[in-house]
Amino acid sequence: MQTSVALRFRRMTRKSYGAFNTMHRIINIGTLTSLALACAYTSTVSAQNVAASEPEYNLGEPDKELTGVTVTASKTATPLNEATRLVTVISAREIAQTPARSIQELLNYVAGIDVAQRGAQGVQADVSIRGGSHEQIVILLNGINVSSSKSGHLSFDFPINLSDIERIEVLRGPSALIYGTGAFSGAINIITKHSAETSLYAKATAGMHRLMGAELRGAMTWGKTENSLSLSRRSSAGYRTNTDYEIYNALWQTRLNLPAENKMDLQLGYNEKKFGANSFYSAKYPNQYEHTQRMIASLRGDLGGERLRLLPTIYWDREYDCFELVRGTTFGQNHHIVNNYGAGLIANYSSLLGTTTLGGELRYEEVIGNKLGTPRAKPESYYTKFGSRTNVSLSLEHTVKLDKWLISAGTLMSHNTLLSGKYTFLPSVSVNYHPLDRWSFVATWSRSMRLPTLNDLWYTDPVHKHGDNLQPEYAHSFEAIAKYQTSHVEAHLSYFLMKGSNLIDWVKFDRTETAFTSHNIAELTNQGLEAGLALRLGEYLPFLGDAGRLSLDYLYMTQQHRAPGVAMSKYALNYLRHKFTAQLAHNVGSRIEALWALRYQDRVNQASPFATLDLKLDYRLTNHLRAGLELNNITDTQYADIAGVPQPGFWLSGSISYSL
């Protein structure tokens, strides 16, 4: 139950979410749906599908210790430290502290995530988890799948501002049973703010390279509904030739509160991007350009009683993409419109025998354009081709608690019309052993599958060529986790192993070839270690202030593969061998809060190792007015995440915000 703005919980809440404020806490949830736990600092937790409505965090207010937390989610509720998944939660408070200007930049501070940026400030980046590709993760907005079925390059083209976010939850590792076949190596769920407590928020930003931005969000309660509207525009002239951009966002949300703590959530959104894409997809063409639009609409319910909960969902999103291989010309130009329609239902039943969950989803995808699909009988303008597919999935899962053990097992059955007559079963088993209050040990095994994207199946241009008879990719994954947690210290160590077959990649069979071809790699194995440590320092080092904390995160990974005939790989064989992140937060006097963020990464096969240092200063002018200063890449390091696409050097920006 929430007892203060600082979110101290002392007993179970019967709502469909459990929010809590802590530092690198480990939350215990046996099964997951769409993960939702609010914490004041990055936390490693297990979570389930949740949507929260907490007020904005006060950066100057210390976090409170949580006692006896139980999180009630859409599938099951379990006490603290009995997690069967490893989930990193980035809270609203940490989002406000970090020197990030986009979700992609924010995710760069998590060691287990590889953010290969093409354009800065959230223009475009390939985000992957534990050596997987950017096509192998699912992106969700309030539990609704917003991943691009066309290409993972576009999966973050949806309407969201950092100030809209309550928390971001990163599930590391396969999660097909929870999110479907797209969650091959993990999932990222963005939970937005629903509370109308902050009725007005406005922010203006300016900086180097003619950076300009404006945000406006309003919220109000009307009858039984909570409503909010968020608008924004960001632009820059670019940090080098042909890297200019404009980004527009609009997001409307309504929550209808029904009797017995039932609710319905509606969200409508629009995103538009126009940007120079200097060497984004090929160094041979530095003057590329792209214009994308995304519209989303969804309705989600949380209904039922104490024993039986129902979560119906219906959604639609529309992607528009215009790409020019040479800006301002028709050479290599392509136009596409993609529609994704989906409907699903989760039924969750709790009894003395445990918790049983039955789920089902129907998803239809269609594309019309001049590159993807097969020729239309009646072509129109650019839209000469059409393609479609339908996916049906059913899942069954049961979770039981036996003394200090939490055991969960289930399977997902999937059928896609591109694989006529074939049914794929993806089982998963998780075990959590919690011998002592401060310790827990977890082991999981699962099977996963991913279908080719629309680009994988059909895309061809002068430097890319789709392969014939492309097949789904499969993997078996295992993970072992050890976690230790007190009120001031949290640590975790995990080992992961993924053995994949038929992995999809864009490759060359001879280095002299001009085009990459989409192709199934025979075998690929990723394995590695992740370690994290978080310390709350304010009480022990008072000079750091209430904000004092230190967090360290490290990833080490190796890869073995068998890819007969492959001379060059564009994605699958280019992975992070090492990634280390460190964050130190502290107060400067009574009104200023500072956060230093260090990142080091060493990538195999493409870019050279590098390190960057960022700083964010937040100055509380009044209770309603704040000023911020962001210094990104203070050392002016010259680096690239993708060979041939250099990233910005030192970039200074400032902002002022008002909230009511």
Identify the residue ranges that each predicted region occupies:
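Short acidic/polar hinge/loop motifs at secondary-structure boundaries
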Residues: 126, 145-172, 191-193, 252
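Gram-negative outer-membrane beta-barrel transporters
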Residues: 401, 405-407, 496-499, 519-603
